Amino acid sequence: MSHAGAIAALGVALIAAALFSAIHKIEEGHVGVYYRGGALLTTTSGPGFHLMLPFITSFKSVQSTLQTDEVKNVPCGTSGGVMIYFDRIEVVNYLISSAVYDIVKNYTADYDKALIFNKIHHELNQFCSVHNLQEVYIELFDQIDEDLKLALQKDLNLMAPGIIIQAVRVTKPNIPEAIRRNYELMESEKTKLLIAAQKQKVVEKEAETERKKAIIEAEKVAQVAQIKYGQKVMEKETEKKISEIEDFAFLAREKARADAEYYTAQKAAEANKLKLTPEYLQLMKYQAIAANSKIYFGQDIPNMFMDSSSAGPRVQSAKRNEPAAAEELK
C-alpha cells in the first residue's frame, strides 16, 4: 500500500513538473520563439501565458520594443597612430515583431552581438583609420553619432531587415594623458584667444560707436552752421529787398518831386508867358527905375517915363549927360 502511494505521489509530481514546464509567460513588448530538439520552430507567440510540450520544447523571449545596447571600451587607432578608447557607445534600436523569426533564425536570439556590437567596432575603426586625432577628438566628433547610425542602418537593411536604429550616442574618447594635457592647454589658449578677440570686437565696437557719435555731432554742427548761414543769407536778402524797396521809394519820391518841380516850372513859364503883355513890361520897367538908387539930372528925366519906343535914345542921352551933372554937383 505504501509502495502504491509512493508511485502515485511520484506520478503527481511528474505531472506537476510537466505542467509547470509546459506553461510559460511572455512579457508585454516581447515575442516568444520556440526550440524543439535544438531546431527553431516557426511558431511564435505574443504576450501572455502559453503552453508547450514539456521537457522537449524550450522558448526564449525576444524584446521587440525600444532597447539600448551598450558597447563599452572600444579601441580605435587614428591615422596618425594614436590609440584612443571610447568608454561607452549606446545604440537605441528596436526589432519589428514580424521580423523576429527571420532574425533569430539567421542570427540567434542574441542577434545584437553579431549585428550591432561587432558592427560598432568595425565602423569606429574604419572612421578612426582615415582621420587624425584632431579630427576624431574635436573637429569631426559631432558627426560620429550620425555617421555610425547611417552606417549601421544601411548594413542592417541589407543583412537583417526589421531592425531599426533610432539613435547612436558616443562618449568623448579617452586619449593619452600627455596629449590630453596638450589639448587642454590648446583649448585654454583658444579660449584666451577668443576672449581677446571678443575684447577687440568690444573695443572696435566702442570705437565705431564713438566714430558714429562724432559723425553725428559733426553733422549736427554742420546742420546748425548751415541753418545759421541760411538765416544770415535770408537776413541779407531781406536787407537787400528792404534797400531795394527804400531805393525804389526814394526814386519814386525824387521822380515825383522832379515831376512836381517840372510841372511848377512849366506852369510858371506858362504864367510868365501870359504875363508878358506890354502893360506888364511897362510896369516892370517902372519898378526897375524906381528901385535904381542913382540920381539922374538933365532934361531927359521926365522922358524916361514915356513909352518904351523912345526910351532907348533917352536913356542913352541921360548916360551922356551923367558926367556933366556930376561935375556940377562938385
From Swiss-Prot:
Residues 319-330 have a biased composition (Basic and acidic residues). Gene3D superfamilies: Band 7 domain. Residues 1-2 are cytoplasmic. It is found in: Endoplasmic reticulum membrane. Belongs to the band 7/mec-2 family. PANTHER family: ERLIN (ER LIPID RAFT ASSOCIATED PROTEIN) HOMOLOG, ERLIN-2. Mediates the endoplasmic reticulum-associated degradation (ERAD) of inositol 1,4,5-trisphosphate receptors (IP3Rs). Promotes sterol-accelerated ERAD of HMGCR. Involved in regulation of cellular cholesterol homeostasis by regulation the SREBP signaling pathway. This is Erlin-2-B. It comes from Xenopus laevis. The gene is erlin2-b.
